């Protein structure tokens, strides 16, 4: 998809790190971290952390960020996660801080080649394909 998502840290609003606008690699060693299984499988962070990667204190992994957010809310640690998955606005006790330098990932959608879709799913996919085609056309240089 023609968009990216941003990695960062989910934490309690009363955490000392919450006062910072961004989180740097040197901020994380020694902190109890919750990492997504996606993070571990793809090893998204080893390059970002550099030599400090081995010093990370990953106390558990999660499949669903919602479950990790409950642990973060209870003060068990800090979740390495993508932005805008868990509500952090309003009266939420949680906040998200992006990593610095920025770590972005592309978003993808996949389906089986000969999949039978419901009418709603079929219309959604058609609309998505039109939007992506329009984005690509707008993003490509004008042909002379």
Show where each model-derived region lies:
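Beta-alpha-beta core module
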Residues: 1-6, 20-21, 66-114
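Secondary-structure junction motif
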Residues: 17-18, 25, 31-54, 117-126, ...
